[in-house]
């Protein structure tokens, strides 16, 4: 899976950071220390870490991921990363 989306809400200085969905690479999620959660009312799971996005981005860079783009949507910040 060469593409990855991560996001955080409201404040980017603190976590949690959403790092994956049900289809994400389990080994990568374990490396990030992510836990699988399902929010009340959702019929899908997401992986979260308590780290702020900067820490997550540093970990992903060490694994060969590079940021392709970043945007803000309302109070949510989203990064798209790619690994060659």
From Swiss-Prot:
Q: Which UniProt keywords apply?
A: Cytoplasm, Membrane, Nucleus
Keyword Kinase listed: no
**Where does it reside?**
Nucleus; Nucleus membrane; Cytoplasm, Cytosol
Q: Which GO terms describe its cellular component?
A: cytoplasm; cytosol; dendrite; melanosome; nuclear membrane; nucleoplasm; nucleus
Origin superkingdom: Eukaryota
Q: Does the keyword Transmembrane helix apply?
A: no
Q: What is its main location?
A: nucleus
Q: In what tissue types does this protein appear?
A: In epidermis, expressed predominantly in basal undifferentiated keratinocytes and in some but not all melanocytes (at protein level).
Can you tell me which family this protein belongs to? Belongs to the GFRP family.
Name recorded for this polypeptide: GTP cyclohydrolase 1 feedback regulatory protein
Source organism (scientific name): Homo sapiens (Human)
